Amino acid sequence: QSFKNFDKCFKSNSLGSQEVFKFCLDNNIKLIYSATSASLGNNGKDKDLSPYAFTKSKNIEFLENLKKWFNFKYEVIYFYNVYGPNQICKGDMATVIGIFEDHYRQKKALPVVKPGKQTRRFTHINDTVDICYKAWKKKLCRHYSIANKKTYSILEVARMFNTKIKY
């Protein structure tokens, strides 16, 4: 989506994030930064695959420099396919599980791109909120990667709904 909405992506992830960083720095507020696991793949080389991954990874570099220059306090949390109540179920930003949930509720077959073997790691929203709170309480300036250890193929996830699947 960041290719299609480059301006929005850049304004939000670069300019918007820098404003938040500055506000936290000016007001001595510790930041909990939501990073993206999209920039971690392929030994970090995936950070250049999209404007989204690139801008998010540049923000990490900027945070590291703010720490060196101003002793800026933050915790960085990498999220993996968060799901749970009120997840996005429709539109360009819908999650895989959200799309499946929406189709399931409408009694439609779940859409899976063949062969369905693409794998993902998922994290429930409650676990995400819990680790954000725990990270905020610590004063470590660390990076946390939040995901279930088990990976699932998209087809495995679709089959968990016990309904029709459309390729």
PLM ranges: what are they?
Residues 43, 85-88, 155-157:
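Short beta-loop-alpha junction of Rossmann-like oxidoreductase domains
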Residues 20, 39, 57, 88-89, ...:
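Short, electropositive, low-hydrophobicity segments enriched in small/polar residues
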Residues 16, 41, 53, 84, ...:
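Glycine-centered flexibility sites
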Residues 16, 96, 153:
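Conserved alpha-helical elements of sugar-nucleotide-dependent glycosyltransferases
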Residues 1-82, 104, 126:
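N-terminal Rossmann-like NAD(P)+-binding domain of SDR-like oxidoreductases, especially those catalyzing
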Residues 58-66, 96, 100, 157, ...:
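Hydrophobic alpha-helix immediately C-terminal to the catalytic Tyr-X-X-X-Lys motif of short-chain
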Residues 49-52, 80-94, 114-125:
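Glycine-rich "substrate-gating" loop/helix at the edge of Rossmann-like oxidoreductase active sites
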Residues 102-167:
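C-terminal substrate-binding subdomain of Rossmann-fold SDR/epimerase-dehydratase oxidoreductases
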